[in-house]
Amino acid sequence: MKNLDFAYKSRKKTFPVLEDISVRIRGAQLVSILGPNGVGKSTLIHCMNRILDPTAGAVTINGYDVDGISIKDLAKFMGYVPYSSVDNFPLSVTDTVLMGRHPHSKWGTLDDDLRIVHEMLCLIGIEDLADRNFNELSAGQHQKVMLARGLAQEPRIMFLDEPTSNLDIKYQLEITKMLRRLSREKNMMVIMISHDINIAAKYSDNIIMMHDGGIFALGKPADVITSENIKHVYDVDAKVIMDEGRPHIIMIDDDDTNYDDDHEFSVIATKSGETYKGP
């Protein structure tokens, strides 16, 4: 990207979102985009994958402007997993993931497409959902299915907008670790928006930290995730410690209220129907 700008426009006013963003990302790696709400993270990846057209500047792949690449060819090259699926698919999970093969299809569904779909379902650990109706699944299951669909495209670049937001901590770690592994195994660039700084720091090769519509810092996690940067971008105090060469943040509570453990509590109803009073 070079000198990228984007603004939403109404009849009377322009609302700038991104201003003069220039960054070059190379090779198979996991890149996490961090920053508070409203700084333009989703807009940035939407400009990268041509969902939105920049107001100014250009996005290039291997020297080619994405504007000159057909949508179908671009879909062979780029995959995208949105923040949450609002799509209504009256389809089975298998058929939903099979939609990811569309950019590669010629005349109907081939055995190779079905094989790849099955591999992706097994990779994400949802093969037991293969025959379930997509619309009957939970939010977390939706997210896994959409991730499998994106991977079924076999893209060279994968964009993900908070891919673990509806998952519990076990699957957040597993999915993020898997994305880093896939970047190596499939020679794929993975660009992921995240709000979990510690998970991003643990697994990312590089970090882009955004603030006020621009890139505030970029580079290795240890160089980007510092107490000073966290304070400037998020306006919170944090202590950063190093764990096996990776930064880990600990929030500093400036509330000077003293708490003790001498608090009574009660559970009104338990599974057995009895009332339990705490210590």
What are these regions (language model features)?
Residues 233-279:
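ABC ATPase nucleotide-binding domains
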Residues 98, 111-129, 154:
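Conserved ABC ATPase "signature" region
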Residues 133-137, 141:
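Conserved ABC ATPase signature
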Residues 57-65, 74:
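Conserved ABC transporter NBD signature motif
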Residues 158-162:
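Catalytic Walker B motif of ABC-type/P-loop ATPase nucleotide-binding domains
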Residues 34-36:
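The feature captures the beta-strand-to-loop junction immediately N-terminal to the Walker
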Residues 49:
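Helix-to-loop junction immediately C-terminal to a conserved catalytic motif
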